């Protein structure tokens, strides 16, 4: 009889066990937070260590155009070069981790990037969404979406002005 009761309790306990499918606190979220800090601080080796070998990164591109972590870091270094300061507004960051019906683990991030253009002092404020797929504690896929058109237009205008100044100096 004790065995039957024990088996009943065991089966009930096992039957009620479920994995967490949604959370706002996890080691994966902590890894994303540290990766964002690494980006802001220019700690590129630490930043890249969060990614699995062969990770595919899709920042403002479709899945037909993946980048490696090395390509992504090179691109990010270039994109922040014109700025005297840049950071995320950490007080407004939002994170969540979900486990899909297929058992995939994803971390989503919503934040606000702020940067000050060195040449003009103009501040840019850009909403950012990032989502990361994790396998064995490493990022295997990353998607990122933000609109940097205003920055690009400003940089294009500054380059045009610099060309005009250079042309005027040459003709004098």
Spans of model-derived segments:
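A mature extracytoplasmic/lumenal domain signature
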Residues: 51, 61, 111-113, 130, ...
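Sec-dependent bacterial lipoprotein signal peptides
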Residues: 1-16
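Exposed beta-sheet edge and beta->alpha loop/turn motif
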Residues: 109-138
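Short, low-complexity N-terminal intrinsically disordered segments enriched in polar/charged residues
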Residues: 16-41, 45, 161-171
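Short, solvent-exposed coil/turn segments at beta-strand boundaries
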Residues: 49-50, 102-104, 132-139
């Amino acid at each position: 009889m004790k065995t039957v009761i024990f088996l009943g309790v065991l089966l009930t306990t096992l039957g009620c066990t479920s994995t967490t499918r949604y959370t706002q606190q996890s080691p994966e979220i902590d890894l994303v937070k540290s990766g964002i800090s690494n980006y802001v601080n220019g700690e590129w080796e630490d930043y890249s260590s969060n990614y699995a070998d062969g990770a595919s990164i899709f920042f403002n591109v479709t899945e037909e155009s993946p980048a490696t972590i090395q390509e992504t870091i090179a691109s990010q270094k270039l994109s922040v070069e014109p700025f005297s300061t840049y950071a995320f507004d950490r007080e407004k960051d939002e994170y969540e981790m979900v486990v899909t019906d297929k058992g995939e683990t994803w971390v989503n991030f919503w934040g606000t990037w702020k940067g000050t253009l060195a040449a003009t002092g103009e501040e840019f404020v850009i909403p950012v969404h990032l989502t990361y797929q994790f396998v064995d504690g490493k990022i295997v896929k990353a998607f990122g979406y933000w609109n940097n058109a205003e920055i690009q237009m400003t940089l294009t205008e500054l380059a045009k002005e610099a060309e005009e100044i250079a042309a005027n100096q040459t003709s004098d």
